Amino acid sequence: IVSAGTEVCLVVGGGNIWRGREAENLGTEKTTGDYRGRMATIRNARCLQSFFENHGLVTRVRTSIPVAQCGEPYIRRRALRHLEKKRVVIFAGGIGSPFFTTDTCAALRAKERNCDGIFMGKNGVEGVYDDDPRKNKNAKLIKKITYSELLADNLKVRDNTAVGLLVDSSVDVRVFNRN
């Protein structure tokens, strides 16, 4: 894809391992759990960077929280310059604030860059469904849906903040099973 001239940037997830019930069971408050999740995304970004560079791609990790030895600080114009130079840019640390998901970060970075699309890897689902297919075997795959319909129907393939950011955009989202 990169050799064909496509600018590629990735938003890395991985924070869910520290949030939700697991964090609560450890007595961790939500804010602390979210920051631990941000650090997990930085770790995952470094793993991806190594993998890509071992396969001949030039990459840069940009972090939204300061971790100088692990990645460059996120500065929009510098990230754009890396893309112009045909480098793969890997965004880590979410948007740098608690209570916002990696989905929101992907939507924000896509809008900042005027991206054509987002490929969103989800755990165990092949797309958007009318109900959770892991809980309802009769859930139906929805082939095409607008952001406004996602919000109105309260479908939870991604969080509503991320969907809200994209309502007035032309960014196309494709959901795929990352497993």
Predicted segment positions?
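Polyanion-binding loop/helix "lid" in catalytic or ligand-binding cores
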Residues: 1, 49, 94-95, 138-179
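Short coil/turn connectors at secondary-structure junctions
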Residues: 4-7, 55-59, 84-88, 113-117, ...
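Glycine-rich beta-strand-to-loop/alpha-helix junction loops that act as flexible
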Residues: 8-15
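Short, active-site-adjacent cap segments at secondary-structure transitions
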Residues: 15-20, 68, 98, 126-129
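Ligand-binding beta-strand-loop-alpha-helix segment within the catalytic cores
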Residues: 23-89, 104
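Gly/Ser/Thr-rich active-site loops/lids in small-molecule metabolic enzymes
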Residues: 32-40, 44, 109-122, 138-155
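Alpha-helix C-terminal capping segments
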Residues: 40, 46-55, 108-116, 165-169
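Internal active-site segments that recognize and position negatively charged phosphoryl groups
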Residues: 77-129
